[in-house]
Amino acid sequence: MERFLENVMYASRWLLAPVYFGLSLALIALALKFFQDILHVLPNVFALAEADLILVLLSLVDMTLVGGLLVMVMFSGYENFVSQLDISAGKEKLNWLGKMDATSLKNKVAASIVAISSIHLLRVFMDAKNVPDNKLMWYVIIHLTFVLSAFVMGYLDRLTRHNH
């Protein structure tokens, strides 16, 4: 009975495979939105004010960071929790594949969230005159919470690695 339960639990990791595939569909949706924004801004680029163009560019950078985060979670999560990626020797392979454990992934995700939050906060500050002060305050508090959380996770990871 124990062996059966262990085999079922081990096989259940494959339930995550469609979830990771779903992230690739989310990446496609993000890419479509990215190019929709580019196609929307290009015809009007000369009529846009510099601040408006910068806001659009920050939005594109934001989407790019989210896309990178999706790729990192998709591949690392699949390799850590489902199965190794079988990429033939002749094909290009990302140098971090197979090297990122769950803790490294967690730290990279935290750093990515801080970067995404920073871009979002910069966008908000560029339009600060149209944002109520209490809302600005909450944006800063939330961002600082992300920064502090990432710092604490990295610090705790360093402590646990040092003690082992």
UniProtKB/Swiss-Prot annotation:
Pfam families: UPF0114
Recorded topology in the membrane: Multi-pass membrane protein
Membrane-spanning residues: 15-35, 53-73, 136-156
Annotated disulfide bonds: none
Entry keywords, A to Z: Cell membrane, Membrane, Transmembrane, Transmembrane helix
InterPro entries: UPF0114, UPF0114_bac
Location(s), subcellular: Cell membrane
GO cellular component: plasma membrane
Keyword Magnesium found: no
Family from the record: Belongs to the UPF0114 family.
Name assigned to this protein: UPF0114 protein YqhA
Taxonomy of the source species: Bacteria, Pseudomonadati, Pseudomonadota, Gammaproteobacteria, Enterobacterales
